[in-house]
Amino acid sequence: MEANQTNQDNRPLRILASHPDTGTLRLIRDSISNLLNIEVDTSPSSEYAFQLAVKRHYSLFLFGIDMPNLNGQLLYDMLVTIYPKIHPEASSFPGVVFIGNENESIKSDEIRKDARVKDFIIRPLSIDRIVRVIKNSIQVNES
């Protein structure tokens, strides 16, 4: 098996995914780790995802737009505020891909105006779509 992907800081690429549906998280984790050889941390709790982001450096975030207690946009805004202070060695702030349902597609145009938002994907997800979005969002070395 090849070595894990690395970014420009020569750190292993790592993605944090948070969504209330554990089936969605399993599909994301298995697709990315098996097909792209990128480490993925997952949590159905946005509060725990926040704690993980404080502890580790990530290359990309995938957040559910409609999360209980702390929605994906608010979670990302909170991380934008503190991430550079707790990870000063990082050369850039991770982008985000939001995951929504069909009824949330209206929000996607407004959300995509932020340059840090790499994509807004609608469920149900497919393996091909997940892999394509990740490849378009971060620099992935082709083997």
Describe each PLM feature range.
Residues 1-30, 77, 82, 86-93, ...:
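Non-catalytic signal-transmission and effector/linker regions of two-component phosphorelay proteins
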Residues 44-60:
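Acidic, metal-coordinating helix/loop segments flanking the phosphotransfer/catalytic sites
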Residues 74, 100-120, 132:
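Alpha4 helix (beta4-alpha4-beta5 surface) of REC/receiver domains from two-component response regulators
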Residues 86-106:
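A short, hydrophobic beta-strand element within the central beta-sheet of small alpha/beta folds
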